[in-house]
């Protein structure tokens, strides 16, 4: 199958602003705000523990979105939120890879422990391989990036282990790596074209700037995953009309 970049980009918009897509925007957004608040709390605790001259840490305002909890609680919260983000990522991939408009019970219960474990390991492995490729030369890094683009999708959608997912992603990308690179670059450039103006329009470090950038980044993350899963469906020949999986009877109606 040949990847159609335009179709992936437009379908990504449609899926992002569907009922399920907007639900994921909300879930990702809430999780990101919780994570930012936990990290800001850790930063405040770290700065407070430093032996700095009086007034050295004083600023025009306190750290935005920090929590009135201890550093230990904030650290635990950050880890829990990261795990929750990974789980939401898995459910999103399953819903969009099946081309569903609703979130079914099966998408968030099916072998979730196994899939989460392999997803985390895959993120580390793919990240390291891509980083090594970029350190050696830029081209090998890009080659690895597009070749392993669907590893996380195979793990979430097909319940595969890390090695099988890497192998299948490599095979699926074969023959379409240039098109996949173009797709990644378009999304990457679009991401910065939309988010970069916020640095000029809103006060740096303000709560408003933090909220606006987090909301925008959340929408763009969901869009990116929608585009990748659409490309996955295209290359697997699952993008034909009526080819998507029908919602099962246990649909949650979200």
Predicted regions and their residues:
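Hydrophobic alpha-helical membrane segments
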Residues: 1-163, 167, 171, 175-254
């Amino acid at each position: 199958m040949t990847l159609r970049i335009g179709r992936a980009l437009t379908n990504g918009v449609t899926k992002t602003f569907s009922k399920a897509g907007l639900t994921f925007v909300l879930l990702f957004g809430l999780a990101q705000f919780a994570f930012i608040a936990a990290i800001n709390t850790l930063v405040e605790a770290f700065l407070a523990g430093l032996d700095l001259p009086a007034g050295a840490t004083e600023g025009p305002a306190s750290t935005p979105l920090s929590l009135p909890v201890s550093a230990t609680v904030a650290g635990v919260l950050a880890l829990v939120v990261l795990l929750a983000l990974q789980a939401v990522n898995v459910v999103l991939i399953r819903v969009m890879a099946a081309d569903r408009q609703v979130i079914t019970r099966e998408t968030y219960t099916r072998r979730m422990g196994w899939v989460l474990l392999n997803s985390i390991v895959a993120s580390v492995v793919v990240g390291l391989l891509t980083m090594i490729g970029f350190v050696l030369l830029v081209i090998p890094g890009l080659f690895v990036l597009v070749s392993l683009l669907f590893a996380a999708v195979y793990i979430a959608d097909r319940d595969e282990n890390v090695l099988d997912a890497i192998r299948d992603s490599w095979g699926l990308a074969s023959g379409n790596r240039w098109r996949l690179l173009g797709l990644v670059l378009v999304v990457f450039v679009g991401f910065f074209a939309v988010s970069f103006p916020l640095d000029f329009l809103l006060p740096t470090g303000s709560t408003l700037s933090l909220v606006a950038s987090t909301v925008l980044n959340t929408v763009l993350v969901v869009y990116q995953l929608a585009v990748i899963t659409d490309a996955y469906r295209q290359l697997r020949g699952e993008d034909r009309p009526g080819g998507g999986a029908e919602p099962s009877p246990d649909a949650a109606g979200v």
